[in-house]
Every structure is written in structure tokens, then in C-alpha cells.
């Protein structure tokens, strides 16, 4: 199973048994944290520094992939399309991927641009991270353009309001 934008490794936990785990992140510091996390929770993952725009794998390598809070960090529409096509390329026929992105419909972003630089505190300093805020229709369009069969698009499970438009995250399950 490929974990794109694996960060510090927490999203590996549900898959630590029964899967060969691969994790990619553009940040070598996050991969160091993922290595520590895998040791702490007693699982092995092959970790690599890589870019989602050019995945370092042959075609049809993975049965499964996840990308939790990764694609919304890609800055341009064209690059997001390239990244989704790359995901499709490395999935085996019939392979499935689960991904989450931030939702543009969150009330805190109603009057703001879909391109945001969000401040984060890191080791006592403020750093800014890029976020593209997706709409449900935009995500569906990009995934369809990449050639995926869309199995489901919905708010995160913890969201309970009747209008999905206001959820924090959009979740998608796709099949090649």
C-alpha cells in the first residue's frame, strides 16, 4: 500500500498488518518522524523522499493507495491534474485509492480565495503552508479527468450536519 504525503506516519497504523507499506513525502524531516513512529508502533514501511508529480515507481505497482491531506498542498491546477494521473499510473488495474482534501465550503473560508497560505506554529516559529481548497465538483472533475472511476465522495465520517458542503474535509474513494 502506498501512502502519499505520509507525513509522520500515523496513517500507516490501520494497515500495519497484512500490507507491504510504502510511504512518500517531500519532507525528509517528516520521513525521519515516520521512521521513529514505525519503530514505536512496531511496523515496517519503506520510506522515500519524492514528489507526487513524478512518482518513482513503475506502472501498475500498487493495489492500494492513500493520500490523507496531501493533494491540497499542490499549488497549481495543472500540477494537481498531473499528480492524480501519476496516482492512476502506479495503481494496478482495479486498484483503489482513498484520499482527503480540505473543503472550500468550510465556513472559515467562505469569503476567501481557494488558494490559501495557512500559518502553522513549528518549533516556536510561524511557517506558512499552501492549501488549495477544493469544492466537491472540482475534485470529482479532476479525478474523472485522470481516468478514475469514482466510487464515493463524501464528508469525513465525523461530520454530522445535513449539508455536506460545510465539512472540513472531502473524502474520495476511487478505482483505476
Could you say what each language-model-derived stretch is?
Residues 1-3, 7-54, 78, 82-85, ...:
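Class I (Rossmann-like) S-adenosyl-L-methionine-dependent methyltransferase catalytic domain
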Residues 28, 59, 72, 76:
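Active-site acidic-Proline motif in GNAT/NAT acetyltransferases
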Residues 36-39, 63, 67:
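Short, amphipathic alpha-helix enriched in basic
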Residues 53-65:
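A short acidic, Gly/Pro-enriched loop at the edge of an enzyme's catalytic core
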Residues 64-78:
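A short SAM/SAH-binding and catalytic strip from SAM-dependent methyltransferases
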Residues 89:
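Basic phosphate/pyrophosphate-binding loop/patch that engages nucleotide-derived ligands
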Amino acid at each position: 500500500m502506498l501512502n502519499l504525503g505520509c507525513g509522520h506516519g500515523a496513517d500507516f497504523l490501520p494497515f500495519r498488518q497484512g500490507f507491504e507499506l510504502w510511504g512518500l513525502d517531500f519532507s525528509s524531516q517528516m520521513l525521519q518522524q515516520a521512521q521513529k513512529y514505525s519503530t514505536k508502533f512496531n511496523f515496517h514501511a519503506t520510506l522515500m523522499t519524492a514528489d507526487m508529480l513524478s512518482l518513482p515507481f513503475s506502472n501498475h505497482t500498487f493495489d492500494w493507495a492513500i493520500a490523507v491531506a496531501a493533494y491540497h498542498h499542490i499549488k497549481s491546477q495543472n500540477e494537481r491534474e498531473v499528480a492524480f494521473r501519476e496516482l492512476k499510473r502506479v495503481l494496478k488495474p482495479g486498484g483503489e485509492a482513498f484520499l482527503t482534501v480540505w473543503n472550500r465550503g468550510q465556513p472559515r473560508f467562505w469569503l476567501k480565495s481557494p488558494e490559501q497560505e495557512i500559518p502553522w506554529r513549528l518549533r516556536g516559529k510561524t511557517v506558512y503552508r499552501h492549501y488549495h481548497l477544493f469544492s466537491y465538483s472540482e475534485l470529482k472533475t479532476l479525478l474523472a479527468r485522470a481516468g478514475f472511476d469514482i466510487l464515493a465522495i463524501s464528508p469525513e465520517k465525523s461530520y454530522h450536519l445535513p449539508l455536506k458542503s460545510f465539512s472540513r474535509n472531502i473524502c474520495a474513494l476511487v478505482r483505476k
